[in-house]
Design a protein with these regions (language model features):
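Acidic, His- and aromatic-enriched active-site or binding-groove loops in soluble protein domains
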Residues: 12-18
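Extended, low-complexity cationic-aromatic segments
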Residues: 19-105
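Short, basic/hydrophobic alpha-helical segments
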Residues: 98-119
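Acidic/histidine-rich, metal-coordinating catalytic segments
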Residues: 115-129
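Short hydrophobic/aromatic beta-strand element in the GNAT-like acyltransferase core
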Residues: 2-6, 76, 118
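Helix-centered, glycine/charged polyanion-binding patches within enzymatic domains
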Residues: 125-139
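Short aromatic-enriched loop/helix-cap "lid" or pocket-rim segments at secondary-structure transitions
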Residues: 3, 48-51, 132-134
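Conserved short alpha-helical interface segments
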Residues: 1-10, 35, 41-44
């Protein structure tokens, strides 16, 4: 059995500061007026079958050919509220600053209208910034 940890690079104080901020957020108790929401996104290739899979035989799995046809890509937005055990997923055709801003707006307007402030934990992807919100909406 192994345990995995994110080991900061030597001399990277900025990394340690950010990591400690996130760990502090995760240790805070649940508060519905200040929910903790983790958000991420990923693009996925959409593939189709070139040859129909062979039907299942008793005791055997389905046989699927390795050849596939590419049907484009989609972007998956995931929002998780770990202290409540709640999640929400949306799929878009692309990954733009506006798509991210619209996802955040939907989260705030539709799923957390009662919150005073949402504590949002996310990575440093170029679209995940306040600038994206300014580009999508009037300040």
């Amino acid at each position: 059995l192994s345990k995995y940890w994110k080991i900061p690079p030597d001399g990277c104080a900025a990394f340690v500061v950010c990591m400690e901020d996130v760990l502090d957020v995760y240790h805070a108790p649940y508060d519905p007026q200040f929910p903790l929401v983790c958000m991420d996104e990923s693009n996925k290739q959409l593939v189709g079958e070139v040859h129909a899979p062979l039907p299942l035989a008793p005791g055997c799995g389905q046989i699927i050919d390795h050849e596939y046809v590419r049907n484009g890509v989609a972007d998956i937005f995931l929002e998780v509220e770990p202290l409540r055990g709640r999640r929400h997923v949306e799929i878009t055709e692309q990954r733009t600053r506006k798509d991210w801003a619209m996802f955040v707006k939907g989260m705030l307007d539709e799923r957390y209208p009662q919150a005073i402030k949402v504590r949002l934990v996310m990575d440093n992807l170029n679209t995940h910034s306040a600038a994206s919100l300014y580009e999508a909406f009037e300040p």
